[in-house]
Amino acid sequence: MVEIKVIHGDITKMTVDAIVNAANTSLLGGGGVDGAIHRAAGPALLAACRPLHGCATGEAKITPGFRLPAKYVIHTPGPVWQGGQHNELQLLANSYRNSLNLAAENHCQTVAFPSISTGVYHFPLSIAAPLALKTLQATAQTTAHTVQTITIVCFDDQTQNVFSTALAALTN
C-alpha cells in the first residue's frame, strides 16, 4: 500500500528519490517552484533540460537532481487555469499521473510533489487538491510495486490545509 502524506516545507530540501517540478513547457526554468528547483540544483539542471526540447502540458520528463538531495527531478508543465472549459482538469490529472508513472519506471520508491498549477497558473486549490490526490491514489494502484511513499510538499499553510482536508476526505 502506497502512503500519501501532506507536509509544509521546501521541496528542494526533500531527501527522496524524485521531486516533481511544476515546470513550464520550455523546461528552461521560471518562477515559483520551478525557479527554486533550478537554483538549488545548479546550472547543470538547465544544461540537462535543453536537449529535452521542452515538454507538452500534462506530460513528464526526467533529469538527474544534480545538487539537490533528490536523485531525480521529474518536470511536468501543468495547465494554466482558463475557467475549467479548456481540458484543464484532465491536463492536471495527466501531470500527476505521468509524473508518478515516470518515477515508477525509474525505480523511485519515494516521490515528492508540489501543488501543480495552483500558483501563477491560477488553478483553484479547492479543485486541484482533491483532483491531485484522487489521481495519485488511483495511479499508485499500478505503481505500488515500486513507489512506496508520495509526499505533497506545500509551500504555505493554506495549501497544506486544503491538501490535508482533501486527503482526510479521500481516506475516510
Curated annotation (Swiss-Prot):
Stored InterPro entries: Macro_dom, Macro_dom-like
Gene3D superfamilies: Leucine Aminopeptidase, subunit E, domain 1 (3.40.220.10)
Disulfide cross-links: none
A Pfam family the protein falls into: Macro
Domain Macro: 1-171
Annotated PROSITE patterns: MACRO (PS51154)
SMART domains: A1pp (SM00506)
Family: Belongs to the MacroD-type family.
Protein's name according to its UniProt entry: Macro domain-containing protein lp_3408
